[in-house]
Amino acid sequence: WNSKWFDVALEESSEVKVGDRIVRIVSAPFFVALKVEAFEDRGEGDFISSTDFEDISCLFNGREAIVDEIASSERLRGFLAGKFAAYLLQPELEDAVEGFVQTEDDPDLRKRLVLGRFRAVANLMTVAGQA
């Protein structure tokens, strides 16, 4: 699997000591970009059965700052905005997100929150076009 973002994500990753090991942590925007590529490659764009898209949905569900983090990433903003704009046009997207947030206390609220964050990223296309 070839990712156009992997090498850059690794270069810009941070090192964290876990026990007696050092692990590399990529930023949330790079994690999303890598998951988007995996979703479209091995997940074949199947929103409902893709574990990569489930990971994306979970990140958008649980990370309040994700939109701001992506907006701040000059390198990834346009790429991710375009992808999410296209995803929002797919009718099965809402069903997939709904399935991924079913374990939450208020699944409908979480679904709306995730979709709202997807829309906010898609709306960054305007910002990316002006950058």
Each language-model region and where it sits:
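Compositionally biased terminal segments of proteins
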Residues: 1-131
